[in-house]
């Protein structure tokens, strides 16, 4: 139970940070947004923005498992983070990096929607459609494209 509480607290802290990061992207502060994403991933998940952008799809999905169960909440939070990271890369005209982020975000949202205990945002359909459009515009690498099939 303690492990789940820690995970939920990390997700909550990450969610608060996402609001600030989204504001940076709205203000076209792409470098600052990527630095903030990297900082949050380091603090909350002991990782990096580049690591999350390059993580193999199966390992990305495994990050959202706890005690053998898939956490739709964790998947949606990571998907939001990856979407923002993709937006920052797209703002810097880094199409390959943007595609890698968008593709992974789409993969996570699809998994969240298919989860047995899926408590998902009522806007998930809109988010899925938008991520599909962005993934079409900024194709992900072959590993993610294969996982999305």
Indicate where each model-derived feature is located:
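Start-of-helix signal in alpha-solenoid helical-repeat scaffolds, especially tetratricopeptide repeats
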Residues: 7-15, 72-80, 99, 103, ...
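Short coil/turn linking the two alpha-helices of tandem helical-hairpin repeats
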Residues: 22, 86-87, 93, 112-114, ...
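Residue at a conserved register position within TPR or TPR-like alpha-solenoid repeats
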Residues: 24, 82-85, 89, 109, ...
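N-terminal alpha-helical interaction modules that lie
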Residues: 1-75, 110-111, 133-149
């Amino acid at each position: 139970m303690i492990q789940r509480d820690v995970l939920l607290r990390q997700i909550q802290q990450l969610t608060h940070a996402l609001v600030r990061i989204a504001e940076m992207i709205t203000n076209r502060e792409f470098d600052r947004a990527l630095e903030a994403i990297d900082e949050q991933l380091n603090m909350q998940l002991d990782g990096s923005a580049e690591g999350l952008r390059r993580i193999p799809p199966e390992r990305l999905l495994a990050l959202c498992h706890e005690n053998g169960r898939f956490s739709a909440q964790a998947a949606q939070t990571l998907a939001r983070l990856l979407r923002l990271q993709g937006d920052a890369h797209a703002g810097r005209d880094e199409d390959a990096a943007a595609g890698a982020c968008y593709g992974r975000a789409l993969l996570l949202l699809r998994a969240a929607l298919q989860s047995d205990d899926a408590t998902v945002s009522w806007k998930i359909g809109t988010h899925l459609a938008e991520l599909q459009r962005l993934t079409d515009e900024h194709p992900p690498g072959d590993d993610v494209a294969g996982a999305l099939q």
